[in-house]
């Protein structure tokens, strides 16, 4: 644990505003212009950002992989129509929409509500990239023998998608995990 509060200024004797690292006062990275501990603020910000980024990644993967698997499995007109909708949605400028929507939210709305709203808006405009990759992986997996065997045994389309195809395309999601976390962090940083 960090010995200082990230919000409260520390006015201990010998600690000045904008001080360099002071080990005797446990200010390992010093203090900022308001006398707050920089290390405490970094750790607190990192914790919040990682929770936000992992929530973002989970929601993007859920939405993008579900839509991509359904498009890849059904193919034909479902795939063609779905792909056109995804292409149109992907061309909406993501960062501008986030900035516009967040600026319209009234200031009396609580901080947690604003963070959840930002998360939902970012997910709504970011799931399309995962859809393309999951669609391609589903096309590849759909041609394998276990899908044919499941169809012959009477499994329905949703059972095949969620019980057979989705678990076998997890490698695609694992590959994109660090990149999606980095996108979430850099997008929130760009809003600052």
Please give the residue ranges for each predicted region.
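Helix-loop interface residues and adjacent transmembrane-helix termini in multi-pass membrane transporters
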Residues: 73-77, 108, 112
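Hydrophobic alpha-helical segments of integral membrane proteins
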Residues: 1, 25, 38-42, 78-85, ...
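Faces of alpha-helical transmembrane segments in polytopic inner-membrane proteins
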Residues: 43-47, 56, 60-67, 86-98, ...
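Short, intrinsically disordered, charge-balanced linker/junction segments flanking boundaries
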Residues: 189-192
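Gly/Trp-centered helix-boundary motif
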Residues: 1-61, 65, 69-70, 91, ...
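Juxtamembrane "helix exit" motif at the C-terminal ends of alpha-helical transmembrane segments
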Residues: 2, 105-106
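ABC ATPase nucleotide-binding domain helical subdomain, centered on the C-loop/LSGGQ "ABC signature"
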Residues: 143-146
């Amino acid at each position: 644990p960090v010995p200082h509060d990230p919000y409260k200024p520390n006015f201990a004797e010998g600690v000045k505003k904008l001080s360099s690292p002071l080990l005797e006062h446990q200010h390992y990275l010093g203090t900022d212009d308001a006398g707050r501990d920089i290390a405490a603020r970094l750790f607190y910000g990192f914790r919040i950002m990682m929770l936000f980024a992992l929530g973002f990644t989970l929601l993007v993967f859920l939405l993008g992989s579900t839509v991509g698997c359904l498009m890849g499995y059904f193919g034909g007109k479902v795939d063609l129509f779905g792909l056109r909708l995804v292409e149109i949605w992907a061309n909406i400028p993501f960062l501008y929409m986030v900035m516009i929507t967040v600026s319209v939210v009234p200031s009396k709305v609580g901080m947690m509500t604003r963070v959840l709203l930002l998360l939902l808006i970012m997910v709504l405009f970011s799931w399309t990239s995962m859809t393309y990759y999951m669609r391609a992986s589903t096309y590849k997996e759909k041609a394998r023998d276990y899908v044919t065997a499941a169809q012959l045994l009477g499994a329905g389309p949703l059972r095949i998608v969620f019980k057979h195809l989705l678990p076998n395309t997890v490698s695609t999601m694992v590959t994109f995990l660090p990149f999606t976390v980095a996108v979430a962090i850099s997008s929130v940083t760009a809003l600052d």
